């Protein structure tokens, strides 16, 4: 393996104390599934790896979903989770009316206490980007899991190209890593194998 690891990004990723999974809703899945250029299956596999890892480590997980209405009855009908990605009772769930997760005051309060988080999920060109910008303005540290995220195609641009541009834009406000690098950075380190003396 010949990859070079950016030490600053590695250290920053290891400080993630919350995993935020955005917009893992069936309506978003259905929209992305129609765009053959989106790498939806790979993105969801990486989302599941990040979720399992966070649960194994006891890291808190926040699931967010955008809603079109403030009426709770309408929200529940519009916001079904993708099968297999339903939050557990121990997970936090935040709904937001605008693209940024920070439009939910409770989300803002909790992240303000924690200070750093990793983010991934669907509709990255909207929710992940807006949330990363708001986090940066609040002095919070974000790690974007680029391969555990997917973006929608826009106008005459396919989903893959939009996601490349989205990732570059998020890099202005957050650290961007692969899921594998985040898993390694957040895994417990043991002194096993170290020789002293």
Give the predicted meaning of each segment.
Residues 55, 66, 140:
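Histidine-centered active-site/metal-ligand motif
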Residues 15, 33-62:
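A short alpha/beta connector and helix-capping loop motif
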Residues 1-18, 52, 72-197:
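Active-site-adjacent betaalpha module
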Residues 18-24:
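N-terminal nucleotide-binding beta1-loop-alpha1 segment
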Residues 28, 69-71:
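Short, active-site-adjacent cap segments at secondary-structure transitions
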Residues 21, 64, 145:
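Generic enzyme active-site microenvironment
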Residues 25-31:
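Short acidic, Gly/Ser-rich segments with clustered Asp/Glu that frequently serve as metal-coordination loops
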Residues 65-67, 122:
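Short, well-ordered beta-to-alpha junction loops that form the rim of enzyme active sites
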């Amino acid at each position: 393996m010949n990859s070079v690891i950016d030490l600053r990004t590695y250290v920053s990723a290891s400080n993630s104390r919350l995993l935020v999974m955005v917009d893992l809703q069936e309506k978003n899945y259905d929209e992305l599934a129609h765009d053959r250029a989106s790498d939806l299956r790979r993105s969801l596999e990486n989302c599941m790896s990040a979720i399992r890892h966070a649960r194994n480590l006891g890291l808190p997980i926040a699931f967010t979903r955008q809603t079109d209405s403030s009426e709770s009855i309408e929200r529940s009908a519009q916001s079904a989770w993708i099968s297999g990605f339903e939050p557990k009772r121990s997970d936090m769930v935040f709904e937001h009316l605008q693209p940024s997760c920070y439009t939910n005051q409770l989300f803002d309060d909790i992240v303000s206490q924690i200070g750093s988080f990793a983010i991934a999920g669907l509709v990255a060109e909207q929710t992940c980007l807006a949330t990363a910008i708001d986090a940066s303005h609040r002095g919070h540290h974000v790690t974007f899991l680029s391969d555990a995220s997917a973006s929608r195609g826009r106008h005459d641009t396919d989903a893959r190209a939009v996601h490349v541009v989205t990732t570059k834009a998020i890099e202005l406000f957050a650290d961007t890593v692969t899921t594998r690098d985040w898993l390694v950075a957040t895994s417990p380190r043991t002194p096993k194998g170290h020789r002293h003396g």
